[in-house]
């Protein structure tokens, strides 16, 4: 092991610490309520506003997820809802309202829904009735569980198969979530209209964008607000008519131009585009890997868009790595690599146009989500910006391992291009397959 390479135990501790820092390792206000969900039933609260989570089951001490959400909405200030290991919360109450009585779980006040314990991860199954969560107002933090079975294709309700973040929402943090098997016209898993939404260490896979509208899209994510996606993977989602996994749509209601910042993240093997940014939207990509998508890796469409990228790989996508509007504003001269010379990277010492990065398929290598890492002979190794932080490399990679690592042992440690920094903490560096 080279001196700069972390031990397996140290890496695991760093990941736990990073997750804690990303989430909520701070004391709650004294007035906060804490509810522990102990029932898988989908039953509302019997006396909303009394400060007690007590479902309408006639049994003392029964707290359902729906009842806990209703009590948290009625309780002033920030409240916590703790989920129980191994429980599956299947939503069964059909109907649409904003009170969390039926359909999705509506968040109207500051609330955290959490699972940070050991054991089998809880699952919130929307059961095809509607999405799982809708954040109307207040701040919301969702941590540590799976979101499945969401459907947003009802009349007047087409956005966010698993989660919808509305324009009036406050700070929204989504961390350590797995969102899979959800469907919507706009944002198969996540739809964001919010101005302060962050996705950290999440995995989106097998979500679908339906085709009921001509501008449907975003099989995993549709953004019309301000969204940061970091240390996350977006894999194997299916967009209709090639509209792809992540869509950034301009002209959000009552706000400025939408922005998506993609950092230390992997977007791979999606049906359609990896990322589609339309009109006056801004896409910022840092230390990311966008590869193996069925049509185009990144498309900047329409007029007035902005595309900024550094230390990132766009490669081996089905049709082209990039399709970029002639009117787009570009800032791409920052140690980037594409495999087919379509991303308008200036040829020179700080970019690598037309170079195959030689990556693995998305697999788990010890982090939360599947990632595509460099093969041992990959040209991305030690080729990113020589500076750490500021205008240079991110200080950690997608799996929260430190950068840089002197993988080749030549005494000169420098960051790798893309989401993953190759180190010796991998049993098999070069699997039989490649991306």
Predicted feature locations:
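Predominantly extracellular beta-rich ligand-binding scaffolds that present long acidic/polar faces
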Residues: 173, 192-204, 216-217, 221-372
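N-terminal, post-signal-peptide segments of secreted/periplasmic proteins
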Residues: 32-159, 165-170, 304-426
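Right-handed parallel beta-helix
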Residues: 139-240
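N-terminal secretory signal peptides that target proteins for export/translocation
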Residues: 1-14
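Short acidic, low-complexity intrinsically disordered linear motifs used
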Residues: 425-435
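N-terminal signal peptide c-region/cleavage motif recognized by signal peptidases
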Residues: 27-30
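Sec-dependent signal peptide recognition
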Residues: 14-22
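Acidic Asp/Glu-based divalent-cation binding sites
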Residues: 78-81, 88, 188, 219, ...
């Amino acid at each position: 092991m080279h001196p700069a390479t972390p031990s397996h135990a140290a890496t695991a501790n760093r990941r736990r610490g990073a997750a804690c820092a990303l989430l909520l390792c701070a004391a709650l206000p004294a007035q906060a309520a804490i509810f522990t969900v102990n029932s898988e039933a989908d039953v509302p609260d019997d006396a909303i506003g009394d400060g007690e989570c007590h479902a309408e089951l006639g049994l003392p001490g029964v707290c359902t997820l729906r009842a806990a959400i209703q009590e948290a909405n009625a309780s002033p200030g920030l409240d916590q809802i703790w989920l129980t290991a191994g429980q599956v919360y299947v939503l069964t109450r059909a109907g649409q309202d904003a009170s969390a009585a039926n359909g999705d779980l509506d968040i109207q006040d500051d609330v955290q829904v959490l699972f940070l314990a050991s054991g089998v991860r809880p699952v919130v199954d929307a059961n095809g009735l509607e999405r799982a969560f809708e954040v109307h107002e207040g701040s919301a933090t969702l941590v540590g569980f799976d979101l499945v079975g969401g459907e947003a294709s009802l009349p007047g309700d087409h956005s966010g198969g698993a989660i919808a973040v509305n324009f009036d929402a406050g700070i929204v943090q989504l961390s350590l979530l797995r969102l899979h098997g959800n469907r919507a016209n706009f944002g198969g898993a996540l739809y964001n209209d919010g101005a302060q939404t962050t996705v950290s260490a999440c995995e989106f896979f097998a979500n679908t964008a339906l085709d009921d509208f001509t501008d449907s899209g975003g099989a995993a994510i549709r953004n019309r607000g301000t969204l940061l996606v970091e240390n996350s993977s977006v894999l194997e989602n299916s967009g209709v008519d090639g509209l792809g996994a992540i869509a950034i749509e301009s002209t959000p209601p009552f706000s400025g131009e939408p922005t998506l910042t993609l950092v230390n993240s992997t977007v791979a093997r999606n049906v359609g585009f990896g990322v589609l940014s339309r009109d006056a939207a801004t896409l910022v990509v840092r230390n990311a890997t966008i590869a193996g998508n069925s049509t185009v890796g990144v498309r900047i469409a329409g007029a007035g868009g902005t595309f900024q990228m550094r230390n990132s790989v766009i490669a081996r996508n089905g049709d082209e790595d990039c399709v970029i509007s002639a009117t787009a504003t570009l800032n791409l001269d920052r140690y980037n690599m594409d495999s087919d010379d379509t991303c308008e990277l200036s040829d020179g010492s700080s970019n690598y146009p037309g170079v195959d990065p030689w990556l693995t398929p998305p697999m788990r290598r010890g982090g939360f989500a599947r990632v595509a890492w460099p093969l041992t002979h990959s040209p991305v190794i030690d080729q990113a910006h020589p500076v750490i932080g500021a205008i240079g490399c991110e200080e950690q990679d997608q799996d929260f391992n430190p950068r840089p690592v002197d993988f080749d042992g030549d005494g000169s440690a420098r960051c790798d291009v893309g989401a993953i920094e190759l180190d010796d903490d991998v049993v098999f560096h070069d699997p039989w397959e490649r991306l």
